[in-house]
A protein has these predicted regions:
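N-terminal Rossmann-like dinucleotide-binding module
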Residues: 1-47
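Active-site loop of classical SDR/Rossmann-like NAD(P)-dependent oxidoreductases
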Residues: 35, 283-297, 311
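Short acidic low-complexity segments
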Residues: 50-62
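Beta-strand-loop-alpha-helix segment that lines the small-molecule cofactor/substrate pocket
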Residues: 66, 72-73, 77-124, 139
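C-terminal helix-rich "cap/oligomerization" subdomain common to oxidoreductases
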Residues: 66-69, 222, 298-331
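Predominantly a Rossmann-like dinucleotide-binding segment in NAD(P)-dependent oxidoreductases
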Residues: 123-208
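Contiguous beta-strand/loop segments that form the cofactor/metal-binding neighborhood of enzyme cores
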Residues: 184-260, 293-307
Length: 331
């Protein structure tokens, strides 16, 4: 039985708390911390889990095996470095931090202590994603021809009116680092990191915000495969993110929680679950917690078996670097 603590009790905590309650035969929540007394009280009343009012209480308790860091991105480096110094494994909400330089320092702090760092990029855990990864990695679909990602979401102005939302200082970026990171992470898992990126990046009249809410990018891989990235939070009312793969022996579409593979021999294969992952529209938390539970289960397995999680710090750095390249190309 592992003992864990939660740091950060804002919007992101709900799927994690539900996941931990589901996994109560494997893990026990020792503490839940927020500097806000109101958030601590609301969390304790809703989930019936113990709370504390000092981060030091968690770090000094040697019985705590791991910490879930669910705080704003610009706080991640400091908190994770303190967790590493205290010998705690960490499950970290995306992104790693607000810049790749800070993200690299964060990952090093955990690796240098031989601690497990798992990053919450839960779309990797979808059965549909895993099936497509398998088909491409095994060569069953043949050589990759094209790979594209479409992130067509809606966020009202009220979303960006929240303090720090969409700013470089707190979030590190806009649609790519906050929303598109999930789909781009899956794209890399399927196709690898592209060799060349050319892009356009802008902020539309739909939003008043510091960072980008619309990106169009062209990608080229060493294999000569091509692709595009289209990401926005201006697409009312929002549609599920999707990835389209063209390969030698078939074409695949991954949308929401379902993948459809159309083989050249006439077969059609479906993988995953019917429905949608949710979160495409104004209600950003309108999604099931199944894949967060899968992240937690994989994290616990990684600790117990002394192996890397599915999305380690090193894996998460790949998508950070791709986002940097897209933004730099777009000026």
């Amino acid at each position: 039985m592992k003992r864990v603590a939660i740091v950060g009790l804002g919007m992101a905590v709900t799927p994690h708390a539900k996941s931990l309650l589901d996994l109560k035969d494997r893990v026990r929540v020792a503490y839940a911390y927020s500097p806000s007394a109101a958030r601590r009280s609301q969390f304790a009343q809703r989930f019936g889990l113990p709370e504390c009012d000092r981060l030091e209480t968690i770090l000094e308790d040697r019985s705590v095996d791991a910490v879930a860091v669910l705080t704003p991105p610009n706080t991640h480096l400091e908190i994770v470095e303190r967790c590493a110094a205290a010998g705690k494994h960490v499950l970290l909400e995306k992104p790693l931090d607000v810049s790749t330089a800070r993200a690299e320092k964060l990952v090093h702090s955990m690796n240098s202590k031989h601690l497990v760092l798992a990053v919450v990029l839960q779309n990797r855990h979808k059965p549909a994603t895993k099936r497509l990864v398998q088909l491409l990695a095994s060569g069953e679909l043949g050589r990759l021809v094209a790979a594209s990602a479409y992130v067509e979401l809606w966020r009202p102005q009220s979303y960006y009116d929240q303090p720090g939302r969409g700013t470089k200082a707190r979030d590190g970026g806009g649609v790519l680092l906050t929303q598109g990171i999930h789909t781009l992470d899956v794209l890399i898992a399927l196709a690898g990191e592209p060799a060349e990126v050319k892009s356009f990046v802008t902020t539309t009249p739909v939003h008043r915000m510091e960072t980008e809410d619309l990106v169009c990018a062209a990608l080229r891989w060493d294999s000569r495969a091509l692709g595009v990235v289209y990401a926005t939070t201006s697409n009312y009312p929002g549609t599920p993110e999707r990835i389209e793969i063209v390969a030698e022996r078939g074409t695949a579409t991954l949308a929401g929680t379902l993948a459809e593979i159309r083989w050249h021999d006439g077969r059609t294969e479906r993988a995953g679950e019917e429905g949608t992952a949710g979160g495409a529209g104004a209600d950003t938390m309108a999604f099931p917690h199944d894949y967060h539970r899968a992240v937690w289960s994989d994290f616990l397995d990684a600790i117990e078996r002394k192996r890397a999680p599915l999305v380690s710090g090193a894996e998460a750095l790949k998508v950070h670097r791709l986002i940097d390249r897209i933004l730099q190309s777009g000026g």
